[in-house]
Amino acid sequence: MNILLVGSGGREHALAWKIAASPLVKRLVAAPGNPGMAEQCELRAVGPTDVPALVALAKEIAADLVVIGPESSVDAGLADQLQAEGIPCFGPTAGAGQLESSKAFTKAFADRYGLPTAAYRVCESAEAARAALELFEPPYVIKADGLAAGKGVTVAQDRGEAEAAIDDAFGGRFGAAGARVVVEEFLEGEIGSLFALCDGEASMLFGWAQDHKRVFDGEQGPNTGGMGTYSPAPVFTPELVEQVRTRLVEPAFAGIAADGSPYRGVLFVELMATKHGPKLVEFNVRFGDPECQVLMLRLESDLVPYLVACANGTLGDMPPPVWRDEAAVCVVIAAKGYPGTPAAGGEIRGLDQDLGDDVVVFHAGTKRDADGTLRAAGGRVLNVCARGADLRTARDRAYAAIERIEFADGFCRSDIGWRALGR
């Protein structure tokens, strides 16, 4: 098979690492990819939202499958155009992609199809959002409506902080994504990430993990795209998994199909496990980043047949995936200043050495100079991942590897996995 993988982050590097290991794959091309992905695939300098160029590239390499990594490609309508050209694609249409690209759409969708979620108000102005605060008790949750790279959510402890978040959104901090906001009820419980595949009709659960959104240890500081993950996560008891499947996953797939946009790809369900059962926090229409990294380390099965089955409508013929009876941890190394303005261009050394058993480093935001020097080129720069017999072993391996990487402008959290280890 010839496969085109779209994207350039740590999630896409993890997908490339797993896809390249498949005996079914003859040629793997990434667009645009990153320096780390060059070990697994050919790189082409085509951006993830340049739909005409991506379709042309898929035709050029005679792609048997296009795998869409980032949400920006979904929002740009890449899957729609590929389907129109008869090119098999793993990833939903832009219509189905509204489950991520608009918080207001998702809230209305949840109401329409009975998915449990937090009480909310959609606000078109700062004045309306400030008035909506009267409906809720602190902490307040303020969400930019559109795509904001995981940084558009503020959990405000008091009204002053909430009003500042509202002013930031309507003041242009998130561009068009902040043209309206959702003010919602704060949910008490433990958050988790669950993934499900769908081929337009049949669906299948595809792993779960737990993320760390806040930038600093102890869940302090602003939200990020994710500072680390681990899998399996003890919060996902068999009872909770079944509740998520029946109350969130299956109604979501049925609902989006009823709306005229059958879902093909992976759905990322971010949920809060409350005393009243799971409640939807948000949907994402792609693998989580960095959740994907730990799932790929734990996935024993060949990933490619599942991607193909989603694209071709044969998921119902596939067996459940097989997972390693091991834990996996991902620790994100970010550039200082993230999630604000990250330090750019810092030199990175030490990735060419043996970093230990079952350790894999995925590139997330890197570039390589003409002389081969590796440098930071983003907020989240590296994903240091490790497997182990248990969570503590995997975590220790990841942090031991980080100690051997030289990146003066980088930082990471030191407490990834604290919820599970503290049980």
UniProtKB/Swiss-Prot annotation:
Protein's recorded name: Phosphoribosylamine--glycine ligase
Record-linked SMART domains: GARS_A, GARS_C
Catalytic activity: 5-phospho-beta-D-ribosylamine + glycine + ATP = N(1)-(5-phospho-beta-D-ribosyl)glycinamide + ADP + phosphate + H(+)
Entry similarity comment: Belongs to the GARS family.
Sequence positions that bind ATP: 133-193
Family matches, as PANTHER family: PHOSPHORIBOSYLAMINE--GLYCINE LIGASE, PHOSPHORIBOSYLAMINE--GLYCINE LIGASE, CHLOROPLASTIC
Binding-site positions, Mn(2+) 2: 282, 284
Binding residues annotated for Mg(2+) 1, in chain numbering: 270, 282
Domain ATP-grasp positions: 107-312
Glycosyltransferase found in the keyword field: no
Cofactor: binding details: Binds 2 magnesium or manganese ions per subunit.
Name of one Pfam family that matches: GARS_A
Requisite cofactors: Mg(2+); Mn(2+)
UniProt xrefs under NCBIfam families: purD (TIGR00877)
Protein's organism: Phenylobacterium zucineum (strain HLK1)
UniProtKB keywords: ATP-binding, Ligase, Magnesium, Manganese, Metal-binding, Nucleotide-binding, Purine biosynthesis
